[in-house]
Amino acid sequence: MFTVLSILFCAIIAGAVVLRMGFKLQMERALDITVFVLIALFGLSIGQDDNLLHNASSIGWAALLIASLGMVGSVLFSWLYQRLLHLPNIPVAVAETADEHKLKKTDLLLRLLRSSKLPLVLLAGMLMGYYGLLPKSWGSSKVSFVVLCLLIAEVGLSLGNRPDLKTVMKSVDFKILLLPFFTIVGTLLFSALGAIVLPFSLRDVLTVGSGFGYYSLSSILILDQKAAVIGQSAAVELASLSLLINLLRELVALILCEPLSRSGRVYQAVSLAGVTSMDVCLPMIVNSRTSPQNMPIAIVHGIVLEISVPLLLSVLC
């Protein structure tokens, strides 16, 4: 885990240095490709595990329960955060026209279609693993870890190379930094309730609930860290559970962030989005029809959670 964190922070510094030299890195395509490779390798591990395939339905129900509990907890705690700090709802900047409403629906559909690529990549990996189309060694945690390190480096470079990072950081105050803390506590406290009815320990439930929508990083980190402790098969099961939980969170956030933001409940939208408040869900939270106040709240929240995921998993795993 120290290796992962070192790569992350070194890459953030490198990205900032490159930006100061006048270069803007285009990391989106590289990040997408690396995520798809990771998800395919993860699917390969699942397809090679017959016991896990037989338990797929029970894992699906467990993921739905933990994801639902975590999302409810994050939204409730963001409301508590708002009440404790006496923060009003952020008003909508401009009313929406009928044409813009149609465009918004089209944009949402495109984003949902983009997210649907990941389950398809996962399924393709599972089929290749099940039918033995690729060497079994490709599904090992060692191969996934190498690709994971590449992803971590790309994430760090992308964060450090953000042109708006300095501006966003200048707008940060103590209140904004508290929101991700409430998101973490609310998500984990409510996710922990799943341990009462599910055949997983409290520690394992907290582990799989600590992704905050960051499906690619959390699932592979769990696989890498847990394999040596509980065995490859059990680690793949937990990592699969984590992947499904975080995919569900992103899909729900894509649907609900826009109406929440437009009703002035920006803190709830940001908290629900988790890590994706800074990228995938950012256009739903910050656009021409919402307040410009939303941007620093959403970006800082996403950055803090993105850094907290490997830190939390290093403790829980």
Feature names for model-found ranges:
Residues 43, 48, 94-97, 204-252, ...:
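Alpha-helical membrane segments and immediately flanking helix-loop junctions
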Residues 1-12, 32-33, 37, 62-73, ...:
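Structural signature of hydrophobic alpha-helical transmembrane segments
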Residues 20-31, 48-64, 85-91, 111-112, ...:
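Interfacial helix-loop-helix linkers and transmembrane-helix boundary segments
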Residues 7-17, 38-45, 69-79, 118-131, ...:
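Hydrophobic core segments of alpha-helical transmembrane domains in multi-pass membrane transport
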Residues 10-11, 15, 62-97, 177-228, ...:
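Transmembrane alpha-helices that form the ion-translocation and gating core
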Residues 4-12, 52-77, 118, 163-192, ...:
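Entry/N-cap segments of selected transmembrane alpha helices
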Residues 23-25, 82-120, 279:
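Intrinsically disordered, low-complexity non-transmembrane regions of multi-pass membrane transporters
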Residues 10-16, 31-56, 124-130, 144-169, ...:
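Hydrophobic transmembrane alpha-helices of secondary-active transporters
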